[in-house]
Each structure stands twice: as structure tokens, then as C-alpha cells.
Design a protein with these regions (language model features):
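Phosphate-binding and adjacent anionic-ligand microenvironments
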Residues: 1-135, 142-146, 153-158, 165-171
């Protein structure tokens, strides 16, 4: 598994995300692909060509002072009450509200449970395999925004992600 701070956990023999284990796995992959006559980069391009060029990013908004926590909660409440129908070039298809354990299809109004533990997280499923997610930090006076898209090339995915991130910031 991976985490935002780029930790890597392979297997169940260690509980800490460890750079040594990650480097060992990377070296093992490089050695394997060398026997296949390709580099790690070649294989990465093979994966992109097969599955698409996915790209993700994040940004944060800081809310300092005594009223910071209230402003963050107000922002989360506003997203829940006034779910955007469109974010930039992308139509919002579904909203996953983990705090209220509900997935809402915005076209039909149908709902289903998330089936996951409750958490103050909103995940917006967008058309064309794009998405964004918003949540307050558990340790800092910040709201974190995550986004991801699928493009047809490295350049296309970078351009689409930049446009989506800008649309989220201006929403």
C-alpha cells in the first residue's frame, strides 16, 4: 500500500512504510525487466499504453486562527448541501459522502451505502475517469483537495490535470 507522504508497504512482515523495502522492490522489478530486454521506464510506458495515462495531484487550503476549524467545517457543509453538478470540463456523476455513509448518483438521485468507516471525506466521481476528493486534515488547520484524471498521453494527462486543479480552486 501507499500513503500521501510516499511511504510504501510491501507484504505484512513490517508495519512501517519503509524506503529500504521500496528500493528493494524497485531493484527486483528493474532486474526482472532487464531480463525481458526493457527498462523500468519502457515498462511504465507499456502500462500507460495499456491502461491509460493516469495522473494525480493535491493542494491544500490553510485556515488559521480561532475560527479556522469553523471555516473548514462550513466549507465541507457547503459541498454537501450544494454539490457541484460540473467541475471545469467534467460533469459530476456521483458523490461519495463517507461521513454520512452514502453514495449519491446525481443523475438519478439513487443512493447506496459506502460500506466503509465514517470519515469527513467527500469524493466526487467525474466523467471520463476523473475525480476529486476533499477532506479536512486531521492534524493541521487545512483542507486537502486531491484530484485525478485519465489522459491519452503524458502531455494530455498533465494538461487535463492542470485544468481540473484550476477548476477545483475556482469552484
Amino acid at each position: 500500500g501507499f500513503e500521501e507522504s510516499y511511504g510504501c508497504l510491501i507484504g505484512t512482515h513490517a508495519r512501517d512504510k519503509d524506503a529500504v523495502v521500496a528500493v528493494m522492490a524497485l531493484c527486483e522489478a528493474a532486474a526482472y525487466y532487464k531480463t525481458q530486454g526493457i527498462t523500468l521506464w519502457d515498462q511504465m510506458l507499456n502500462i500507460y499504453n495499456k491502461y491509460g495515462y493516469y495522473k494525480e495531484d493535491l493542494f491544500t487550503m490553510t485556515f488559521k486562527g480561532a475560527d479556522g476549524a469553523k471555516k473548514m467545517q462550513d466549507m465541507m457543509d457547503a459541498y454537501r448541501k450544494n454539490t457541484p453538478k460540473q467541475v471545469g470540463a467534467y460533469k459530476v456523476l456521483r458523490l461519495r459522502d463517507y461521513k454520512n455513509d452514502v453514495i449519491t448518483d446525481l443523475a438519478t438521485g439513487e443512493t447506496a451505502p459506502t460500506g466503509l468507516p465514517k470519515s469527513n471525506v467527500l469524493y466526487f466521481e467525474l466523467e471520463n475517469d476523473a475525480w476529486f476528493c476533499v477532506r479536512p486534515s486531521g492534524t493541521e488547520p487545512k483542507i486537502k483537495f486531491y484530484a485525478g484524471i485519465k489522459g491519452t498521453s503524458l502531455e494530455d494527462s498533465a494538461k487535463k490535470l492542470d485544468e481540473l486543479m484550476e477548476a477545483i480552486k475556482n469552484a
